[in-house]
UniProtKB/Swiss-Prot annotation:
SUPFAM superfamilies linked to this entry: Glutamine synthetase/guanido kinase (SSF55931)
Endpoints of the signal sequence: none
Species per Swiss-Prot/TrEMBL record: Shigella flexneri
Oligomeric form and interacting partners: Homodimer.
Name under which the protein is recorded: Putative glutamate--cysteine ligase 2
Disulfide bond annotation, renumbered to this chain: none
Example of a GO biological process term: modified amino acid biosynthetic process
Domain of life of the organism encoding this protein: Bacteria
Gene Ontology MF term list: ATP binding; glutamate-cysteine ligase activity
InterPro entries documented for this protein: GCL_type2/YbdK_subfam, GCS2, Gln_synth/guanido_kin_cat_dom, YbdK
Entry keyword annotation includes Transmembrane: no
Amino acid sequence: MPLPDFHVSEPFTLGIELEMQVVNPPGYDLSQDSSMLIDAVKNKITAGEVKHDITESMLELATDVCRDINQAAGQFSAMQKVVLQAAADHHLEICGGGTPPFQKWQRQEVCDNERYQRTLENFGYLIQQATVFGQHVHVGCASGDDAIYLLHGLSRFVPHFIALSAASPYMQGTDTRFAPSRPNIFSAFPDNGPMPWVSNWQQFEALFRCLSYTTMIDSIKDLHWDIRPSPHFGTVEVRVMDTPLTLSHAVNMAGLIQATAHWLLTERPFKHQEKDYLLYKFNRFQACRYGLEGVITDPHTGDRRPLTEDTLRLLEKIAPSAHKIGASSAIEALHRQVVSGLNEAQLMRDFVADGGSLIGLVKKHCEIWAGD
């Protein structure tokens, strides 16, 4: 399928997607019933969409195009209420978090969807292992060239986004020692990590043509980069965050990305170059392994900075942009989080350290999501 023209959208508008876990009490393992829930809510959603993702244990909540985080929060809140009622009617529960703490990938059923079945044929068991749960944020752009500039700018802050959203320390019943373990799942995919370097939209079109020669890429949706342009929406899509445990934290993360995008495109503070990515995977690893306690390295100077310090610096830089777009509350909440030194991954570990079980942890996550 050829790459569509870049659809011009209103700059800085938002679209947010949350991949939620569908679990089956009292054992709180993943259920395979998302299709049943989607059927139950399809005529009750007035804004946004509830839909499938790769496997039957995944339920995606997606907003419509929103002007700001308050509008997005309102849409999510209404969807959440409908989904929770449908889940209760079918003796199921819903929670966030980037990975199910103890699920077995072999049990996961890929949705009966042509694209997902084709992906299963291409990638085999990797797709079942990819039953992990993330938050994706789309930001509107006025042109393809703006999208490429924004993508490179946001890529500088991938470690910050990963650390702030970290919520997947447990996998397959084990403490992985990572803050988020979810990003590691995609390391075997040929398109894992950053997008190959291009400097403008014309070069991106040439890149896509080259990738399509592999026959594994039918559309932009088949590319699993950390950040990717979405020409059919006219957006840049950030894909590195774990699904948070609360709706409020998901909205705050979206506000962070929207405000960062506004700062990047209005002030153009960087002259991007391919060397910017020289230490990308090393800095990304620091955020995954250590969360906000990680240390990132500047590829141009060799300077090393604590991720906590650099995140506070980012929040300060984007505060004026956040004020202009109505996202100040998000930046203030994230500032408090960084100063406290806590993320959701650490709270999960604290629960287990205090004697809680992994089953109890998922139950608590369901209570947190329903109570937010």
